[in-house]
């Protein structure tokens, strides 16, 4: 078998069960991966240098096709209400058939780390069928030092073969697409999808499973740190402003998506970013826009003019979920270490399209756990579907699809860390004010930034607060530089009775969603439920 590449590991592909491969390409650098991807017709080079690819029918994660092997080690540790199970026998059969499918093929191999904290990092080997997938994951994870690569010994293996179509009847899966996680063997198999985000999230799923027993909190969040070492964590679902609000010139960006919180502080799981590209502009997000004009960036499903090779970031012709994968080093004020001290502030972002929640609220540790387990935001349906009513979304831990263990395991760990390090917790609504979506207006970004700045510099703790009658958390009454009217959402509605009705509707949604956690949390967390609902009971 032919082996090429700058750093070929002594622990070869045969250790992972591969036989009769045509060639293995080890730890290729971006320029070489560009050449290989172009030679194979995998994509095109756009103007200014990024590599543009189409992922075909899969333009997002296939959440319904993800499985975890159910065995003696996972029977009582995995949250089976939220995760589909696969038998060990089905996994072994799928694994063997994928290894057989790889025979005669050329594979690209990257040896990388998941986690910037050396105590808790995961040495990960990724086998990919596509050269661009190899570039993608090199951009996203953390590259070892050259001296670490020759003897790299993987703790975790990902095998990514988009051309392998799974037989649902044979393997007990749903479609030809499958993401199969075997935590005991530390292997993930990805088949039947070209969407590269599955590779990145497989590492996150493994860390989400392995870290909590070590008292390390895995988090679906962005993070930044100020000059005084004051770290801030931003939890939030898609569309809440997690990436935008954490990327500010006055603070160093630790990362935009996945982090751990250990005894040593906060650390990025990754060495890159995977940002949405749709409608990206140089005016609104100059730092992210700049990476679309750089060699090394991978752009998924971004429309490109075939003649000029210029990008059309406004077009959703290929996908609404167009993405860019690039190294964190492409962002000017990004951390070189991916590490920061213990957080001083935790921000939980929500885009409340019901216009009930205030723009900012201060949370107790128990309230923080309640809202962390709730993971609330509201999606606004597309006009093409003719739906104008907002849709409430509750994604526990602000990342339910990636949570291998029961949410309360993460919630209890987070609450303990908040108490231990005396962290201030805030709920920030980046959604609507003055009425529901369609009637009210989007929360002014200027106001959100001013409130965040006050929270992070500590001055927000010194203003007068009132207790919200619906949710029981504390809301500032007067903040310098912010229109006081928007601080009280009820006052922004012309029809106060309509606000009260809408508030009770949202309160009821929270209560109904949290019912599944009631038996698993302490009385103080149950008591953090919306106040109006408790009074009505």
From Swiss-Prot:
<feature type="binding site">
    <location>
        <position position="220"/>
    </location>
    <ligand>
        <name>ATP</name>
    </ligand>
</feature>
<dbReference type="Pfam" id="PF01293">
    <property type="entry name" value="PEPCK_ATP"/>
</dbReference>
<dbReference type="GO" id="GO:0046872">
    <property type="term" value="F:metal ion binding"/>
</dbReference>
<protein>
    <recommendedName>
        <fullName>Phosphoenolpyruvate carboxykinase (ATP)</fullName>
        <ecNumber>4.1.1.49</ecNumber>
    </recommendedName>
</protein>
<feature type="binding site">
    <location>
        <position position="285"/>
    </location>
    <ligand>
        <name>ATP</name>
    </ligand>
</feature>
<dbReference type="InterPro" id="IPR008210">
    <property type="entry name" value="PEP_carboxykinase_N"/>
</dbReference>
<dbReference type="GO" id="GO:0004612">
    <property type="term" value="F:phosphoenolpyruvate carboxykinase (ATP) activity"/>
</dbReference>
<keyword id="KW-0464">Manganese</keyword>
<feature type="binding site">
    <location>
        <position position="201"/>
    </location>
    <ligand>
        <name>Mn(2+)</name>
    </ligand>
</feature>
<dbReference type="GO" id="GO:0005524">
    <property type="term" value="F:ATP binding"/>
</dbReference>
<keyword id="KW-0547">Nucleotide-binding</keyword>
<dbReference type="InterPro" id="IPR013035">
    <property type="entry name" value="PEP_carboxykinase_C"/>
</dbReference>
<feature type="binding site">
    <location>
        <position position="323"/>
    </location>
    <ligand>
        <name>substrate</name>
    </ligand>
</feature>
<dbReference type="InterPro" id="IPR001272">
    <property type="entry name" value="PEP_carboxykinase_ATP"/>
</dbReference>
<feature type="binding site">
    <location>
        <position position="201"/>
    </location>
    <ligand>
        <name>substrate</name>
    </ligand>
</feature>
<keyword id="KW-0312">Gluconeogenesis</keyword>
<dbReference type="GO" id="GO:0005829">
    <property type="term" value="C:cytosol"/>
</dbReference>
<keyword id="KW-0067">ATP-binding</keyword>
<feature type="binding site">
    <location>
        <position position="61"/>
    </location>
    <ligand>
        <name>substrate</name>
    </ligand>
</feature>
<dbReference type="GO" id="GO:0006094">
    <property type="term" value="P:gluconeogenesis"/>
</dbReference>
<feature type="binding site">
    <location>
        <position position="323"/>
    </location>
    <ligand>
        <name>ATP</name>
    </ligand>
</feature>
<dbReference type="InterPro" id="IPR015994">
    <property type="entry name" value="PEPCK_ATP_CS"/>
</dbReference>
<comment type="function">
    <text>Involved in the gluconeogenesis. Catalyzes the conversion of oxaloacetate (OAA) to phosphoenolpyruvate (PEP) through direct phosphoryl transfer between the nucleoside triphosphate and OAA.</text>
</comment>
<comment type="similarity">
    <text>Belongs to the phosphoenolpyruvate carboxykinase (ATP) family.</text>
</comment>
<feature type="binding site">
    <location>
        <position position="257"/>
    </location>
    <ligand>
        <name>Mn(2+)</name>
    </ligand>
</feature>
<feature type="binding site">
    <location>
        <begin position="236"/>
        <end position="244"/>
    </location>
    <ligand>
        <name>ATP</name>
    </ligand>
</feature>
<comment type="pathway">
    <text>Carbohydrate biosynthesis; gluconeogenesis.</text>
</comment>
<feature type="binding site">
    <location>
        <position position="195"/>
    </location>
    <ligand>
        <name>substrate</name>
    </ligand>
</feature>
<feature type="binding site">
    <location>
        <position position="201"/>
    </location>
    <ligand>
        <name>ATP</name>
    </ligand>
</feature>
<keyword id="KW-0963">Cytoplasm</keyword>
<feature type="binding site">
    <location>
        <position position="220"/>
    </location>
    <ligand>
        <name>Mn(2+)</name>
    </ligand>
</feature>
<feature type="binding site">
    <location>
        <position position="448"/>
    </location>
    <ligand>
        <name>ATP</name>
    </ligand>
</feature>
<keyword id="KW-0479">Metal-binding</keyword>
<keyword id="KW-0456">Lyase</keyword>
<keyword id="KW-0210">Decarboxylase</keyword>
